[in-house]
């Protein structure tokens, strides 16, 4: 019987590759993908903005009455303004320096709240924040990431605070605020149906990198999670320690100051196998980054008496032949993302760790 070959070259790897996402992974990904939800709800989102033409704050009643998920409404605004994640959290951290804090009292109970003044339809409006600033303002907290965008949430004061900023921020009376939020001008198109549709179409194209990045991240997470589940099913009761984003003792970077992180690490006793995963249907720079790190990682892992394996697949990756070749030359085991190939990886791990 021929000995199983673990360290394939690029041609052998491509012959065994799936190239396109397997159905079971695509189904997992679609349950967490943001893009379809934005496309499906775009017309309803536009309708809400068109109806809110008498008062800028009517939008809150309309969201409530229509049962439109406030986190999905906010996600539309984040994509259209290109102002979410880190920029939004940075605004939250600098909140006190941008918005005047005013004491408000009801029945002698005083609370200090931030105030936002802005122009809309040639009138000046004032909005008093009820929740901002908060300890941390992240996509997960706002339920606008892939994992939680489908969750049912109420229209809280925090949502109202952020929606007002993203809709009218560019119209702030305070020039410093309007400069920070210069892209937050969706509110200026309320009631202007044709202009609003044109703006939204153009902005979705312009910021497609946000949704594209979200999709790539989600797909990558699904692929990594499936590998971990696959390994745990087969090794869970055999004393193997399996970790996502794991480390190997002695494998470092930054002049030895930081342990190197691998997508998956499986360990038994003193031996470990690090696993790096890349499945790209469309070409991007992820595989180039992994290739750039491949030799140094291979050398360090080998020097510590351990092993490194790669799971590489996707039509986009195989367009980067030099990168794939570099990885194949600096790997103890290289497999594609099919059940048959994952079983080859399984045999490699058994051979090296048992």
From Swiss-Prot:
Single GO biological process annotation from the record: DNA restriction-modification system
Keywords of the record: Endonuclease, Hydrolase, Nuclease, Restriction system
Protein known as: Type II restriction enzyme BanI
Lineage: Bacteria, Bacillati, Bacillota, Bacilli, Bacillales
Organism: Aneurinibacillus aneurinilyticus
Stretches of the chain forming a coiled coil according to its record: none
Reactions catalysed: Endonucleolytic cleavage of DNA to give specific double-stranded fragments with terminal 5'-phosphates
EC number of the protein: 3.1.21.4
Domain of life of the source: Bacteria
Subunit structure: Homodimer.
MF GO annotations: type II site-specific deoxyribonuclease activity
Cited Pfam families: RE_BanI (PF24447)
EC category name: hydrolase
């Amino acid at each position: 019987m021929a000995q199983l070959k673990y360290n394939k070259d690029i041609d052998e790897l491509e012959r065994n590759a799936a190239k396109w996402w397997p159905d079971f992974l695509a189904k997992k990904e679609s349950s967490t993908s943001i893009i379809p939800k934005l496309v499906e709800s775009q017309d309803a989102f536009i309708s809400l903005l068109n109806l809110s033409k008498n008062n800028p704050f009517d939008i809150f009643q309309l969201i409530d009455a229509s049962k439109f998920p406030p986190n999905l409404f906010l996600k539309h605004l984040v994509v259209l303004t290109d102002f979410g994640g880190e920029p939004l959290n940075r605004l939250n951290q600098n909140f006190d320096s941008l918005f005047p804090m005013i004491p408000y009292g009801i029945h002698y109970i005083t609370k200090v709240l931030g105030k936002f003044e802005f122009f809309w339809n040639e009138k000046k409006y004032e909005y008093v924040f009820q929740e901002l600033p908060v300890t941390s303002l992240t996509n997960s907290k706002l339920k606008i990431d892939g994992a939680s965008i489908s969750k049912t949430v109420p229209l809280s004061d925090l949502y109202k605070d952020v929606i007002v900023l993203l809709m009218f921020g560019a119209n702030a009376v305070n020039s410093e605020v309007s400069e920070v939020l210069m892209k937050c001008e969706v509110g200026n198109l309320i009631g202007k149906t044709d202009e609003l549709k044109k703006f939204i179409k153009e902005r979705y194209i312009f910021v497609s990198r946000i949704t594209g990045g979200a999709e790539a991240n989600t797909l990558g997470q699904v692929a990594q999670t499936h590998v971990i589940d696959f390994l745990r099913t087969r090794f869970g009761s055999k004393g193997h320690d399996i970790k996502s984003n794991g480390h190997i003792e002695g494998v470092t970077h930054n002049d030895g100051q930081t342990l190197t992180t691998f997508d998956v690490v499986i360990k038994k006793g003193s031996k470990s196998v690090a696993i790096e995963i890349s499945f790209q249907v469309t070409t991007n720079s992820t595989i180039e980054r992994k290739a750039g790190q491949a030799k140094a990682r291979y050398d360090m892992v080998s020097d510590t008496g351990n092993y490194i394996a790669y799971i590489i697949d996707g039509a986009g990756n195989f367009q980067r032949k030099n990168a794939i070749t570099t990885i194949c030359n600096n790997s103890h085991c290289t497999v594609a993302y099919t059940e048959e190939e994952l079983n080859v990886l399984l045999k490699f791990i058994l051979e090296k760790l048992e």
